[in-house]
Amino acid sequence: IIALIGLAIFTLIRSQVMYKKRKAKEKGNETIKQLMQSNNNTEILDLLRKHTREELVKILEFTEENFERTVTAFLHENLRGLRRAMGSVKFEKQLIKQMKRTGTLAMCRLDNNTVLEKGLYFYQGNDFASELVYSIGRLCEPCLEHIDNNFKPLDTIQKGEFSDVTEDIVYLLQICRHKMENNDYEDFENELRKANDLNGQLSHLKREELQRIQTQSGSIKVSMV
């Protein structure tokens, strides 16, 4: 118990230190400085796009790293790795709030017509970022609970199935991140098709797990996770 309390305190302090460092870095961010100083509507819009793109790239990088970390830790019954991923999710939620506040302040510097025309896309981007972080948390939570309670691990077949689809998802996230970093969305239809294919694979895996439950050929707790 003492060790767990110590770990919780360490994680909290570490998160706060990282959060303060990120905020200090944002204060020194040249894009944000220019955003808040400019009075030219066109320039403000261009800078807001740049800032939003930079922030969404960071969110995609977070998602890529922590999705892989969560699944790998679950497959290898690594409780410490899962706790680290969950701590990262809590920290990232704080950064999302800061990102939204900064973006909203920048939006207030645009004229009303531009806000009406472009504002929806900005808020959709924020929702997209929040959903990614929330999804990683929702993925990590049952995995952490499962391992923490020493429930039966995945069998070899299940590990193989989920390892394969995990690699494909991480690779897709990498491609999307690189496209956003370079602001080059040529042939993006290929990534959309790949995402749809992955959704199909996940649906197939879900049906396989339901079949295992019905035939009682595996652990119900494992299949539910």
Question: Which positions does each model-derived feature cover?
Answer:
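Cytosolic, long alpha-helical scaffolding segments
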Residues: 1-225
